[in-house]
A protein has these predicted regions:
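N-terminal Rossmann-like NAD(P)+-binding domain of SDR-like oxidoreductases, especially those catalyzing
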Residues: 1-64, 107, 113-114
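A glycine/serine/threonine-rich, flexible loop-to-helix segment
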Residues: 19-20, 71-79
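Alpha-helical substrate-binding/gating segment
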Residues: 50, 76-88, 98-133
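A short hydrophobic/small-residue beta-strand
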Residues: 4, 88-89
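Short linear capping/connector segments at secondary-structure termini
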Residues: 24-26, 60-62, 91-96, 127-130
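Activation segment of protein kinase catalytic domains
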Residues: 12, 69-70, 88
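A generic fold-level signal
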Residues: 16, 28, 70, 82-83, ...
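Glycine-rich "substrate-gating" loop/helix at the edge of Rossmann-like oxidoreductase active sites
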Residues: 31, 61-72, 92-104
Length: 133
């Protein structure tokens, strides 16, 4: 294997208040079992990279949507209510922000990342830097 690409989630950011999120933000306080499984996925990939000296790239997806999406997600609920002429319930006075990513864009991004493994870089301290870190 030359390059391990794996799916993670924005859920790993847990209760972080600062937005936008950064790959440098702490992700050691998952607030759900789903977030904990994604964080453990990242830790396993990190270990695999160190043990077998191969690059790993984790892609943290944010609210993926598309034609076969989950009906319990907000965007489906909003669309359904709009079609029925019903009121959409808004929280936080409409000040909430959310990133939505269309599934076809996810697929294209994954394929592009799979096509080219990143070059290994070593920092001044001799330790690997991302994506090998």
């Amino acid at each position: 294997m030359q390059h391990l690409v794996y799916a993670s989630s924005s859920s790993v950011y847990g209760g972080n208040k600062k937005v936008p999120f950064s790959t440098d933000d702490r992700v050691d306080n998952p607030v759900s079992l789903y977030a904990a499984t994604k964080k453990s996925n990242e830790l396993l990939a990190h270990s695999y990279s160190k043990l077998y000296n191969i690059p790993t790239t984790g892609l943290r997806f944010f609210t993926v949507y598309g034609p076969a999406g989950r009906p319990d997600m907000a965007y489906f609920g909003f669309t359904d209510k709009l079609r029925k002429g019903q009121t959409i319930r808004i929280f936080n006075y409409g000040n909430c922000k959310r990133d939505f990513t269309y599934i076809d864009d996810i697929v294209e991004g994954v394929l592009r990342v799979m096509a080219k493994a990143p070059e290994k870089q070593v920092g001044a301290d001799g330790l690997p830097v991302p994506p090998y870190k």
